[in-house]
Amino acid sequence: MFDVLMYLFETYIHSDADVMVEQNELTDELSRAGFDKDEIEKALNWLERLANLHDSEREVYVAASAQGSMRIYAPQELARLGTECRGFLLFLEQAQVLNAETREICIERLLELDKPDIELDDLKWVVMMVLFNVPGSENAYQQMEELVFDESDGVIH
């Protein structure tokens, strides 16, 4: 499923291609590209749920977060998000790339991936997908894009 998400993001989102594509047409294109129908369906459902997080009248993930508060991870989150991923999420929040709400959306989307262990690169791409989808997050998206594509500058401190 993650490979399908990456393909879609790189093909349609990151390349500024026409994003308005019929689902059947998209499914056919992905099948021709060699992706399994089940994986395609999972990826499209994942994206639909991401889009619905902002379109629905659901309660906000985090109503308020006190300055200096720390996110405590549940056991199932700890099992899938290693120290490196959790540290990077904290870094992104401290750098104001993520806020409490977008952090929670990222965690929820990461846990819905069909991967037992989530790697740092997976996290970076999911954060970009989330920020791309959140209205008003253009600057945060641009910062994240620089972090992902300008890794040759060295380690981030």
From Swiss-Prot:
Organism (species): Aeromonas salmonicida (strain A449)
PANTHER family (alphabetical): PROTEIN SMG
Gene name per UniProt: smg
InterPro entries found in the cross-reference section: Smg
Protein name: Protein Smg homolog
Pfam families listed in its UniProt record: DUF494
Alphabetical list of NCBIfam families matching this protein: PRK03430.1 (NF002897)
Top-level taxon in the UniProt lineage: Bacteria
Coiled coil stretches, renumbered: none
Family according to the record: Belongs to the Smg family.
